[in-house]
Structure formats: C-alpha cells, structure tokens
From Swiss-Prot:
Keyword Endoplasmic reticulum set for record: no
UniProt-listed GO biological process terms: G protein-coupled receptor internalization; signal transduction; visual perception
Pfam families: Arrestin_C (PF02752), Arrestin_N (PF00339)
Keyword field contains Electron transport: no
Tissue: Retina and pineal gland.
Function: May play a role in an as yet undefined retina-specific signal transduction. Could bind to photoactivated-phosphorylated red/green opsins.
Protein name, entry field: Arrestin-C
GO molecular function: G protein-coupled receptor binding
Family, per entry: Belongs to the arrestin family.
Gene3D superfamilies: 2.60.40.640, 2.60.40.840
UniProtKB keywords: Sensory transduction, Vision
Length: 387
C-alpha cells in the first residue's frame, strides 16, 4: 500500500479560496528556518478580474483588545511577507517543491503555489497564559498565513473573502548537549571559624517536556549554625525585550524538604521535580508554547539563540533554572530572628525532542479540513484562532 502524508486545508467563509499546507509547525534550526510552502485553490469566478494574494505575518501582541478601543494599539508586526499568486507574476515563478508537485496533480489547474522563507531572527511562537478572568486575544507571538482577493496587498480585507491559518515557528532540543550543570557556593558566617558549603548538580543539561529534573544536593555545614529549611524550586524566566525590559519569574514546581542540618554536620540527598503546565493552569503571565486551537500546549520551550543574534528582535526570551534555598539560623528560640538565606541557581534547557525527519518519498497526500468551531472557554477569540 502506498504511503501517504497529511495535508491541512482551510477554506474561506464564502468557499471561494482554500489554502493547503503540509504542516502547522515549522522548525527553526537556528541557522535556517523551514520554508512555508503550500497551494491555494482559487474559484474560477475569482480568476476573471481579481488579484489573489497570500501573506505571512509575524505579530507580537503585548496588550489587551479593549485597549485598542480607545485608540491604543498594543501589537507590533515583526515580519510581513507577501506574494501575488493570481495572476502569477513571471518574476515570482519558482520551481515547485515536492509537496507542491503532488498537490498540483491532485488539485488541478485552479491551484497556485506560494512559498515564504522566514529569517532566523524572528521569535518562536509563544503566548502568555491569561488569568481566569481575562478575555480576548492572548499576549504573545503568533504567525498567520492568509489568502485573500484584493486590488492590492494593503487593502482592508473582509473576513468572509479571506482564509487564515495560524502556524507555529518552533525549536527542538539540540542533538549535541553539554555536560550536566554543577554549582558550588561557600558562605562564611560571623562567629564561625569554618564556612557552610553547598553543592547542587543536575543529572543533565537538556530536559524534555514532561521529564523529571534530577537534582543532587550536598551540604557541608561546618558552622555553628543550623540549616532549618531547604526549598527547591523550578522557575521560568520570561524576558520581554521588544518594548520594555520587563522580566517575569514564575515558580512552576516546588518542593520543601523536611530536613534540618545540625552544626558541624553533613547532608546529601537526591530529588526529582517535574515542571508541568497541568499544575499551573491558572497562573497568569506564564509563558506557553504557541497554541493551535485544536491541540493542547505546554510550558514554553527554552529560547535558543544564534551567536551574535540581536535579542531585542525576538519579542520574548524564555529560560529555566533550578533554585535551591537554605534558611540558616542560630539554635534556640531567638535563632530565627537572625536567620540568613543561602541560594544556589542552575540553568537548564526545557524543550521537545527533535522528531523523526519528514518522509520525502511519499506517493500520495491525505487532506484534513479544519472545521470552523469555537472551543469552550474561548469567547472573544478571533475566528482565525480556530485554524
């Protein structure tokens, strides 16, 4: 039996246009990004006296819709690519990709190709989780492919006469990883001849979503004080670098260890924490991977930067760290009044594993059409988000 590949289809409200894409996720390999190639079917009626365009836009939204009603716009277009697919322009003619060749044979003479090449300095798809009472479009970065007919590409477009699909730009974990993180710190206290030594290490550098983070802790308490509390947290850091220098730190998982370390004593232990969105569903401002409405999402993946890359064009940068905090105090009833905090931080990378390469020798395509439907709890979302 011949092998087949799924192709995604979305039609305009009036049924006159339909866009076909081979995928919804396009991989940023750091040094290049996969091209966005597809086909658009144009009703013969539209081919008489109309121009048809396809665009790819990357937009960073950093404010709510209701602010736009009073004349304030809290969104910035980071990239806008466009091409006129009908009538086709001779200077834009390019060889068909393997996908386009197969779709051209399947769809017939009313199908026209388009292809966009994104630059490597665009951010990946990411969104900030709204609070329970928030409505409207979510803050974050999204990518939209749109097809429409107009006299020119800047004309105001009717949603009925256009078709939009949300796609995602994603990164996957690198195949080659560095050594596991290990950090040591020493704290000298008054009235103690010797210091407190803390060593924290992770079992590896890169973790996949849903995978536990393994942490080893060693404490050499050579002081006259007592380690009264030990707390381990996994924190997500989001730098909003496009319009401000805002930095958001969110604890995504935490464990308090019921252990004390007496004066002149040692302690060691191994712990495991798993950062999951399921445990942080109502945490406002948490960064998530860009969401396609028909699928679930997860905590945002770590941002991987190309050496020398300008961070400010990326909109939002996401990173993770493990923090181990100790509360050190003197013994006795009044000891807590003079307590000190000792903290150790270790960065790590949280990403999806790289999937198996796409098959290029497929013999047929299977078309999956997207229904226009609203999901529960998505009131106020634009229709394009259902794509």
């Amino acid at each position: 039996m011949a092998e087949s590949s799924k192709v995604f289809k979305k039609s305009s409200g009036d049924g006159k246009l339909a866009i076909y894409l081979a995928k919804r996720d396009y991989v940023d390999h750091v040094d290049h990004v996969e091209p966005v190639d597809g086909m658009i079917i144009i009703d013969p009626e539209y081919q008489k006296d109309k121009k048809v365009f396809v665009t790819l836009a990357c937009t960073f939204r950093y404010g709510r819709d209701d602010h736009e009603l009073i004349g304030l716009s809290f969104k910035k277009e980071l990239c806008f690519l466009h091409c006129q697919v009908y009538p086709p322009l001779p200077e834009d003619k390019k060889p068909l990709t393997p996908l386009q060749e197969k779709l051209s044979k399947k769809l017939g003479v009313n199908a026209f190709p388009f292809c966009f090449n994104m630059t490597t300095d665009l951010p990946c798809s990411v969104t900030l989780q709204p609070g329970p009472e928030d409505t409207g479009k979510k803050c974050g970065v999204d990518f939209e492919v749109k097809g429409f007919w107009a006299d020119n590409v800047e004309e105001k477009i009717s949603r009925k006469n256009s078709v939009q699909l949300i796609i995602r730009k994603v990164q996957f974990a690198p195949e080659a990883t560095g050594t596991a993180s290990c950090v040591q710190t020493t704290r000298q206290f008054m009235m103690s001849d010797k210091p407190l030594q803390v060593e924290v290490s992770l079992d590896k550098e890169v973790y996949y979503h849903g995978e536990p983070v393994g942490i080893k802790l060693k404490i050499n308490n050579n002081t006259s004080k007592i380690v009264k509390k030990i707390k381990i947290t996994v924190e997500q850091l989001t730098d909003v670098v496009l319009y401000s220098l805002d930095k958001y730190t969110k604890i995504v998982c935490c464990e308090e260890i019921n252990e004390t370390v007496a004066a002149n004593a040692n302690f060691s232990g191994s712990y495991s924490l798993t950062p999951l969105l399921a445990n942080n569903k109502e945490k406002r401002g948490l960064a998530l991977d860009g969401k396609l409405k028909h699928g679930d999402t997860n905590l945002a993946s770590s941002t991987i930067l190309r050496p020398g890359m300008d961070k400010e064009v990326l909109g939002m940068l996401v990173s993770y760290k493990v923090r181990v905090s100790l509360v050190v105090a003197r013994g006795g009833i009044l000891g807590d009044l003079t307590s000190s905090d000792v903290s150790v931080e270790l960065p790590f990378t949280l990403m999806h594993p790289k999937p198996s390469p796409d098959q290029t020798n497929i013999e047929d395509v299977v078309i999956e059409e997207f229904a226009r439907q609203k999901l529960q709890g998505a009131e106020g979302e634009d229709d394009k988000d259902d794509a």
